């Protein structure tokens, strides 16, 4: 997880993902000073798909892959840097960003269990229809929103919210439950 103040190296809940962490550390060190790199340590687990940044606040989904201890460590690290975080309990989805994504300007795309979550009541919510729920996992970048291709309702909802849409084919990633947010790290380098 990359914030504007620090990098937080996760400890994935799926053992098959641990090599990803090992591969990322040398790359992260190219962009963040060593004293601003923090680590989630066992028994804590945390996966990036369970973390959604809204300004300086981070919503963290408790899931099969992100546990209470991982969330506790993550929020403690955030607070060390003057940031904040809060837990969101998940009921049905693999990761938080499977069903909710912040697209800036106080706007969120929500689907399924996130439509009525009290944690998100203060945001302007754009409800994604269940038949296109996969595409709730969109990415805001530089005033535009990247949307999975072949989900015309979601693309129109995003346009109606006032954004230019960039369509990306994610069909191969979808086969392994991957979404757009799984494929990117967006950050401003410290160095």
Where are each of the predicted segments found?
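The feature marks the mature, well-folded catalytic cores of soluble enzymes
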Residues: 1-191
């Amino acid at each position: 997880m990359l914030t504007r103040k620090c990098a937080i190296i996760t400890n994935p809940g799926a053992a098959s993902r641990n090599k990803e962490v090992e591969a990322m550390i040398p790359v992260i060190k190219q962009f963040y000073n060593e004293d601003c790199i923090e680590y989630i340590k066992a028994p804590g687990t945390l996966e990036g798909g369970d973390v959604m940044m809204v300004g300086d606040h981070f919503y963290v989904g408790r899931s099969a892959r992100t546990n209470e201890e991982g969330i506790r460590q993550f929020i403690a690290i955030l607070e060390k840097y003057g940031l904040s975080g809060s837990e969101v309990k998940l009921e049905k989805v693999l990761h938080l960003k499977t069903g909710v994504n912040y697209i800036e300007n106080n706007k969120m795309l929500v689907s399924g269990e996130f439509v009525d979550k009290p944690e998100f009541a203060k945001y302007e919510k754009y409800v994604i229809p269940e038949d296109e729920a996969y595409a709730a996992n969109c990415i805001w970048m530089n005033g535009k929103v990247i949307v999975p291709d072949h989900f015309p309702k979601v693309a129109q909802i995003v346009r109606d919210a006032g954004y230019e849409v960039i369509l990306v084919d994610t069909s191969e990633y979808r086969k392994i439950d991957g979404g757009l947010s799984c494929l990117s790290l967006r950050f401003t380098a410290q160095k």
